[in-house]
Every structure is written in structure tokens, then in C-alpha cells.
Amino acid sequence: LLLVGRLFRLPHGGLLAMGRKEQENERLEQLIGSEDWTIKAADRPGPTAVLRFSDQPADLRWAAGLVARYSKKKPDGPAEVPVAAEKGARTEKFSALPLPDEEFQSWRR
């Protein structure tokens, strides 16, 4: 997981790996463990993200904001991005605003 895509260490300790292109998204999907969250934009192309080592709701929201930030923008659509997060049989759906760059720069690894 550490060698694929963009990496972020989220404030509550979660490790987020996010694909930069389709090949990395596919590789991340192969690396998903049973305790990992998979996070994707629900209505547009964008990165696949894998959140590991955290069940904190705040880390999940920050991960969703990062997915929204790096997802393809809709010119006529709202700024909020519908996001789906899955962990095993559990699915959570919500909307996320893209995180501003200055908010997450210190999280990059």
C-alpha cells in the first residue's frame, strides 16, 4: 500500500492511499484488506482511496474530502461530491466538499 499513489497520514492516525490514475486505482483495489475502508466518488470519475488503521469518523470524512478534491469536476454540478465508503459489508454514503489544498498539505507522505 505504501508504494501506490498519493499517501496521506490523517490527523487521527489513519493512512490513506489514493490512486492518481486508473492503473493505481486498480492496484489499490487488489490491496484492500478486510479492515480497510474503500472510498470513491459515487457519480463521477476519480481516485480510489484506501483508508487503513482508522475507524474514526473524522478520518473517514477527511478521506472523503480528499477524494472529492481529486475527483473530476462537473462544470454545471454542485461543489459537493457524493461519496461511498465501504468496509466489508458496511457501506456509508454521504456528500463531501473538496478539501482546500492548504488544509491537507502537512498530511502528505
For each feature predicted by the language model, list its residue ranges.
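Nucleotide-activated chemistry modules centered on ATP-dependent adenylation/adenylyltransferase
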Residues: L1-V50, D55-P57, V67-P75
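Acyl-donor binding region in acyl/amide transferases
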Residues: A58-W62
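Helix-rich interaction surfaces within compact, conserved domain-sized segments
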Residues: Y70-R109
